[in-house]
Amino acid sequence: MKYGKIRIEDGNFIFSKHMMMNYLPCKDIIWTYKRKEGVEGGAQKQYSTSSLVIITRRKKRYQFEMTDREIQNCIQLMRALNPQMVTGFPQGSRISMQSLPNTRDLGALETEDGRHILPKRLLRSGSLYHISITDQDMLTHEYHLSTVVDFRTRMECLEKPDTIIEGVQYHEIPIVDEETLGITRLGSPTELLRNFKEIPEEFMLKQYESLVHDEYSIKQYARFLDVLLHQNEGAVLWHCSAGKDRVGVGTALLLCALGVPKKTIYEDFMKTNMYLDKEMEYMIRFLETKMIVDNQVMDKIRLFYRVKEEYLDIVFETIKKDFGSMDMFMKKALYMNPKNMEVLRKKYLV
């Protein structure tokens, strides 16, 4: 099929550059989207142009000016030839999986300098304890998962160990010790109900504050970023128990290091409420069978399964109070000096 100055034949995306024909296998394209430039309308007549943007596994970027219809048809054909190719801007959306409700690909999130996180490289999640075989296959073959970072404590790992996926490297980096684990631990419904009466809402704010104030936790987040620095191929997935507190803060710190604006960081953080909604409904139904659901218990359930902007507020406030700025926190606490920051961005941005 021919689209403007390019064509697709025998599974290859073919185009001319510098008077030479180039053959790009469609299976090597990981991301493609439509880019609009210029402005339409307004007081003076202006124009916009549409381009097809293609990103390859080697992070090479190509842009071809085409009509909207040509772009649409071209993407459809390439997607048929390469079903694993990402199209459009998922922007940190949930990965549709059977057994993992809060697993997300940070791909396509935009940085302040206009770059984007590469899709299928950075994945945040909850526990992999009950991951289905279908979901394992998806992570292995579609996302090329190569590394898992477990933020849980040793006791949590023993109680609900990760399902080991062949060919994947595992790192245990407990963000908190057993004594300060608190509500971030996802226990059984009975355990949670017993703790609900003991844990005030203020505890959550203190918990988030400690994640960037406690020396142990800070060093563990530094280890997490170091794993990402030394990752060469495939996707990295990091998780805790529910994928909201320890993972939420770790993801926020990573996005800061990559130069993602705060507004986007907050949006990603708050998506947990949407993705854990069904888990919360299940818990409520379970407790209703025990005839022990009142308004106070309901409030505690929501406290556990939801996040608030205030939680991330206190993270940034604590960092500013202790280190003066996020830049100093990155440099002094997480060892993300300008050189390491640039290495990280070269690995995961395009």
Predicted regions and their residues:
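Cys-dependent protein tyrosine phosphatase-like superfamily
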Residues: Y3-G4, D10-G11, M19, W31, ...
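A broad, structural micro-motif
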Residues: I8, Y23-L24
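Structured surface patches comprising rigid loops and adjacent beta-strands/short helices at the edges
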Residues: C26-I30
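Ser/Thr-glycine-rich phosphate-binding loops at phosphate-binding pockets of nucleotides
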Residues: A242, R246-V247
